Swiss-Prot record:
Its main location: cytoplasm. Gene3D superfamilies: Ribosome maturation factor RimP, C-terminal domain (2.30.30.180), RimP-like superfamily, N-terminal (3.30.300.70). The keyword Cytoplasm applies. Keywords: Cytoplasm, Ribosome biogenesis. InterPro entries: Ribosome_maturation_RimP (IPR003728), RimP_C (IPR028998), RimP_C_sf (IPR036847), RimP_N (IPR028989), RimP_N_sf (IPR035956). SUPFAM superfamilies: YhbC-like, C-terminal domain, YhbC-like, N-terminal domain. It is found in: Cytoplasm. Required for maturation of 30S ribosomal subunits. One of its GO terms (cellular component) is cytosol. This is Ribosome maturation factor RimP. Belongs to the RimP family. One of its GO terms (biological process) is translation. It comes from the Bacteria.
Length: 151
């Protein structure tokens, strides 16, 4: 997680948890004047639109006071969804046996894009079975990771 995203997660964790939700993760996508801050929340019984609206008001109030982003951006608060992004070792460990899609910073086995089943998480290392081959990826090498939804 980038430094700004880490700082934002630390800043927003308590206010989101005060509403009874879990702060699942943060994505900040810079695109000039059209930057987007995505805040993913989850709850024991899932998340509905009213939950997102309440969390958005709380998050917006904190961001207005703390002002961690100096440029213009759009705030989006949502559920992680069925193809949820994964951010932490604990989140990856919770989905051992499930299929994921990873975008890497540095290639592993000649590729920056991997699809496979999580076989283990050991500290900051993720083991993945890709096309019958076991690969190990450092979590800090993962630019983006998502579950692959099964229908």
């Amino acid at each position: 997680m980038a430094t700004l995203e880490f700082r934002l997660a630390e800043m927003l964790k308590v206010p989101v948890e005060a509403l009874g939700f879990q702060l699942w993760g943060i994505e900040y996508v810079q695109a000039g004047k059209h930057s987007t801050l995505r805040v993913f929340i989850d709850g024991e019984n899932g998340i509905n639109i009213e939950d997102c609206a309440n969390a958005s008001r709380q998050v917006s109030a904190v961001l207005d006071v703390e002002d961690p982003i100096s440029t213009e951006y759009t705030l989006e608060v949502s559920s992680p969804g069925v193809d949820r992004p994964l951010f932490t070792a604990e989140q990856y460990a919770g989905y051992v046996g499930e299929d994921v899609k990873l975008q890497l910073t540095m290639p592993v086995d000649g590729s920056r894009n991997l699809k496979g089943a999580i076989t283990a998480v050991d500290g900051q290392m993720l083991s993945l079975k890709v096309n019958g081959k076991e690969l190990v990826v450092a979590l800090d090498n993962i630019r983006k990771g998502n579950l692959i939804a099964k229908f």
